A protein has these predicted regions:
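Repeat-mediated protein-protein interaction surfaces in helical alpha-solenoids
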Residues: 62-76, 110-114, 274-286
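Sec/Tat signal peptide C-region and signal peptidase I cleavage site
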Residues: 26-30
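N-terminal secretory signal peptides that target proteins for export/translocation
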Residues: 1-11
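Short, charge-rich amphipathic alpha-helical segments embedded
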Residues: 79-86, 114-125, 329
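Bacterial N-terminal signal peptides
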Residues: 14-24
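Non-membrane alpha-helical segments in proteins
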Residues: 51, 85-97, 111, 127-138
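Charge-biased low-complexity segments
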Residues: 31-43, 51-52, 56-60, 81, ...
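Tetratricopeptide repeat
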Residues: 63, 67-70, 105, 112, ...
Length: 414
């Protein structure tokens, strides 16, 4: 389904029928182009789990014996003895070395509980254990636990509020990264997206306005904010009047929220109608503070290319290509930066494919080949990949050329 909007009407194409719809004046159409990373994204080989140092049976026997010893020793010491916490922590590290992240998560949690009993709920000495729990939750594909742990770490470090230091800003950046990752590997949730946008916007504004932290962190938080905006831009569709809908005001959307009864969804719609203007304000900050940064110019050009400003994007691409030809030898799935990198371990269903295709001078794909043949979800992955827009390739003289693209990708399904 495609919806073509203007200020006065919209045409919905469905099968062979053409239905005229009255459009809410002032709306803009959500992006036609699927951000690379939503549904299909680059497969990160670093996500492969390392092999344990011993075979599974031997590891199981070692951990069973260790569990018995831990239960006995912790009972002797009691929950408040710091020595018990050290025992849990040492055992958890051993579980990690043997590849049992489920047990490691359980024992790290016990060590954290002991530390909180002894040093208090606000002690920053918890952070090293919390980091290990974040890693264990990701390895286990435990979305809820991962969200809880990064939220807890974020709260411990002040929720990204000033006064800033490197640790606080790094934790805020990682919190945003994980939250975006969780958002794109599950059913879209409008409340989460709206709250995430507000937090990213606050952080980006504060850091980019701060002369102390602007140079080192403004780019990072700008990328996170653009990442959230890309997700919202894809999922939120314009509000239209549809005579065939249950309600006079219905929304064609790419997720299942009940828009007419949810005020957060209406706020998200309002936000989405101003996405383009908000992106331009970010790019203006970059021009003012980082005028010589060609990588930022490339990100801005990519955004314009995806959002239909072809002439300006091509002009920027050609200027950048004259200085950085290596950026344009091959087509690049967008967005390249901010990269949306789904972790298949956090998805309910995922599958890895190898894709080969041609990318034309408009950045659209054709001749898509996905392997292995017969894999589950192949048709869905092909359709979703076709919706991704690419930065096209240029030849040495700065002319657009059709080019081949090949990569390992992961398909994420609900």
């Amino acid at each position: 389904m495609r919806t073509c909007c203007c200020p006065f009407f919209s045409v919905r194409l469905q099968g062979l029928g053409v239905i005229l719809l009255t459009c809410w004046i002032g709306t803009v159409k959500a992006s036609e182009h699927r951000p690379f990373g939503i549904g299909v994204g680059l497969y990160q080989h670093r996500l492969t789990v390392e092999q344990a140092s011993v075979d599974a049976r031997e590891a199981s026997l070692v951990l069973e014996a260790l569990d018995v010893e831990l239960q006995a020793r912790s009972s002797e010491l009691g929950p408040y003895d710091p020595a018990a916490g050290e025992l849990w922590l040492s055992a958890a590290e051993q579980a990690v070395s043997l590849g049992d992240y489920q047990l490691a998560e359980q024992w790290f949690s016990a060590a954290l509980h002991n530390l909180r009993l002894n040093e208090g709920l606000q002690s920053t000495s918890q952070l090293s254990i919390v980091e290990k729990l974040v890693t264990a939750a990701r390895r286990n594909g435990d979305r809820a636990e991962l969200a809880n742990r990064v939220d807890y770490r974020f709260r411990l470090l002040g929720l990204g509020n000033p006064p800033y230091d490197e640790t606080i800003l790094a934790a805020a950046d990682d919190w945003l990264a994980v939250k975006i990752e969780l958002l794109i590997t599950d059913t879209f949730d409008s409340r989460t997206a709206y709250e995430l946008y507000n937090r990213a916007d606050t952080l980006q504004s504060a850091v980019c306005d701060d002369p102390v932290w602007r140079a080192s962190w403004c780019r990072t938080f700008s990328f996170r904010l653009l990442g959230v905006m890309s997700v919202i831009d894809w999922f939120v569709q314009p509000l239209v009047k549809d005579e065939f809908a249950d309600s006079p005001l219905s929304t064609f959307k790419r997720h299942d929220s009940v828009w007419d009864n949810n005020p957060i969804d209406h706020k998200l719609q309002t936000l989405n109608r101003t996405i383009e203007g908000r992106a331009r304000r970010i790019f203006e900050i970059w021009r003012n503070h980082f005028p010589a940064d060609d990588q930022l110019r490339l990100v801005a050009a990519d955004w314009g290319w995806v959002h239909g400003r072809r002439a300006q994007a091509l002009s920027d691409y050609r200027e950048l290509q004259s200085r950085h030809p290596e950026w344009f030898f091959r087509p690049v799935a967008l967005p390249q930066q901010p990269a949306l990198t789904p972790d298949p371990r956090l998805a309910r269903n995922s599958e890895v494919y190898t894709v080969r295709c041609q990318v034309n001078t408009w950045g659209r794909v054709s001749e898509i080949e996905l392997s292995p043949e017969g894999a589950t979800g192949l048709a869905v992955a092909r359709r979703q990949f076709r919706e991704v827009k690419f930065r096209p390739a240029f030849d040495a003289s700065g002319e657009l050329v059709e080019a081949a693209f090949e990569a390992d990708i992961v398909g994420i399904r609900d």
